[in-house]
Amino acid sequence: MNSNRPLSPHLQVYKLPLTGLISITHRITGVALSAGLLCIVYMLVMLSLGAESYATLQQFMQYWPAKLVYWGFIYALFFHLCHGVRHLIWDAGKSFDKHTLQQYAVYELLASLLLTFMTLLLLYKPEFLWMLDQRFQK
């Protein structure tokens, strides 16, 4: 065997572009959403079992690790949605130049963060929606 052959560098040497990281993250969020849906089905089963299991579920959802997983699921959902919209744009044959790919990757990250923030705001502070409604009626 020839030992003078060049070795391929390890993955730590490569600096993936943002679009590559987004693509990998899209696949990871797809798997996470599948696991999250199993958790949601389990929660629905607990809800259907009666008041005692519902109280247990409420108590469990008060712990910060459970909230962190819940918030992560919401972010993964919106990230996956935004990347899906990006794929629809690509299916239309648009936005294939390098600059636009980078630009849309940043937009995708910002949109998913904004949608997550707005969802959490409406979940934890529903009066915010009422305040917006009052402001726009004036």
Language model regions located:
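Membrane-embedded alpha-helical bundles that constitute the cytochrome b-like, heme-associated redox core
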Residues: 1-138
